[in-house]
Amino acid sequence: MAIHLYKTSTPSTRNRAVDSQVKSNPRNNLIYGQHHCGKGRNARGIITAGHRGGGHKRLYRKIDFRRNEKDIYGRIVTIEYDPNRNAYICLIHYGDGEKRYILHPRGAIIGDTIVSGTEVPIKMGNALPLTDMPLGTAIHNIEITRGKGGQLARAAGAVAKLIAKEGKSATLKLPSGEVRLISKNCSATVGQVGNVGVNQKSLGRAGSKRWLGKRPVVRGVVMNPVDHPHGGGEGRAPIGRKKPTTPWGYPALGRRSRKRNKYSDNLILRRRSK
């Protein structure tokens, strides 16, 4: 990904650094509209996910996370921008006439061929079960449940590593640093997700953030006591508590939020690194 810097004509462009976006001209049969209502509200209209609302209209692209076109070679026709994710997507034309979108693997170019199956080459963009991969393979779009489709390592630049295979399970090191077990029958795609330099982007101004549907983040200490436990006081006052809390009074900033006695606790060999 190439980072595009603007001329310093205004303060907003002076601080702006964006990726040279690939143009998007999606196929009509691979997109559908979304009706976003509530913007972070639940059925009662109460905010449950903050700082959401507005933003430009989007069309959702149907991404093939399952890669179930087995043993049929496909060719990368386009590399497109997807407003619903940081990663780019590829349009694949398969030999049987099927057309699908997949996540763009790093280094893949237009004209490359990909295939999914059980005995396919260990090549960037190919999808196959973990049991057929050698140790040390870099992978992404990893299934947790066989046949459900990839759920892990799908963000831009994400990559996991196959570090061991024993019995019916394979040991993976995920992008977060977590080491966990996954069934060897689950599939994954070889390689790393593209658009690695996405963290080098700088939007430069607040309006660009609003286009993405992100609203301003207001600190609780500058609110009134009726709005937040940190609010109130004369002038710049501290939060008035031993530890910070959420707007609803629950402990924040450090308390573990993972559900206890979750079924996957036995599958996690090492927690993610903070």
Swiss-Prot record:
CC per GO annotation: chloroplast; mitochondrial large ribosomal subunit
Aminoacyl-tRNA synthetase listed as a keyword: no
Domain of life: Eukaryota
Gene3D superfamilies (UniProt xref): 2.30.30.30, Nucleic acid-binding proteins, Ribosomal protein L2, domain 3
Keywords: Chloroplast, Plastid, Ribonucleoprotein, Ribosomal protein
Disulfide topology: none
One of the protein's GO biological processes: mitochondrial translation
Subcellular compartments: Plastid, Chloroplast
Ribonucleoprotein among keywords: yes
Listed Pfam families: Ribosomal_L2, Ribosomal_L2_C
InterPro entries linked to this entry: NA-bd_OB-fold, Rib_uL2_dom2, Ribosomal_uL2, Ribosomal_uL2_bac/org-type, Ribosomal_uL2_C, Ribosomal_uL2_CS, Ribosomal_uL2_dom3, Ribosomal_uL2_RNA-bd_dom
NCBIfam families: rplB_bact (TIGR01171)
Similarity comment: Belongs to the universal ribosomal protein uL2 family.
Quaternary organization: Part of the 50S ribosomal subunit.
Protein known as: Large ribosomal subunit protein uL2cz/uL2cy
